[in-house]
Every structure is written in structure tokens, then in C-alpha cells.
UniProtKB/Swiss-Prot annotation:
HAMAP family documented for this protein: dUTPase_bact
UniProt: substrate binding residues: R70, S71, G72, N83, L87, I88, D89, M97
This protein's UniProt keywords: Hydrolase, Magnesium, Metal-binding, Nucleotide metabolism
Protein name: Deoxyuridine 5'-triphosphate nucleotidohydrolase
Cofactor: Mg(2+)
PANTHER family: DEOXYURIDINE 5'-TRIPHOSPHATE NUCLEOTIDOHYDROLASE
Name of the gene encoding the protein in the UniProt record: dut
UniProt pathway annotation: Pyrimidine metabolism; dUMP biosynthesis; dUMP from dCTP (dUTP route): step 2/2
One Pfam family cited in the UniProt record for this chain: dUTPase
Amino acid sequence: MHALQAKILDPRLGSEFPLPQYATPGSAGLDLRALLKEDTVLEPGQTLLIPTGLSIYIGDPGLAAMILPRSGLGHKHGIVLGNLVGLIDSDYQGELMVSCWNRGNTPFTIAVGERIAQLVLVPVVQAHFEVVEAFDESQRGTGGFGHSGSH
């Protein structure tokens, strides 16, 4: 398991609410919680930047973190991430913030301490561009959307 440096920015984290942890040995994501001052209503179509009370420092340029939606919130309530995916670079050290978007038709109350997103560490490969006049041929070539078949 990889060590991840973390700073607790809200004293409720680790006392009233548990630190992010894996729910099962097979879990890929650590749940992030809404460390709001009070329960907050997210109106249909509204986005809100929600603090997690936590900052992390990955440090290893071969890793990054992604903030992803929780499937139940999206499927059952229409609550997804306003930026779809949050990318946390290895050298970022600020508070983790979650952009929540209510794409549903009814108001949704985000409770203080509610699990609103998940954090997943992913490997990163940095690349540089090698400018060429032509690419080696491939079977697909320049075929774009829908090129590989309809079903």
C-alpha cells in the first residue's frame, strides 16, 4: 500500500467523521466527505464547491489522484461532479474540493459529513511530443466516433 501524506484542515475529520478509508479490501476509492458548516440544499441545475476538510500531497510524479462521483448519488439522485472528474496532480498540496452538480429535477440536501465523492490513486506516464510528418499505418487510421462498429 502506498503512503499518502495528508493534513486535516477541519478538526471534525478524524473525530466526528472518520478519515477517508477503503470500505473493503477490494475497494479502489477512498470516500470523501462534505465538511460543510451546515446541511446545504443543492437546487436542480446548481453546482457547489464543497470542502472536504483534507489536503493531500502525493509527491510521486508517477502517481496522481482522481476525484470521482459516487455511483449511488448519481444514479439515485442525479448528484454528479460538476467537472465530471477532478484531477489532483502529484505536487498539489491544497484542500481537496468537490464540485457537486445537481443534474436532477428535485432539490437534494447534502448533509454535513455525507460521503460525496471518492478519491482514487492512478499511475501517470508523462510523455513528450515527437513531431512527425506521417504516422505508421494502423488498421483504424483516422476513423473516429462510431468507426469500430455500431454494437
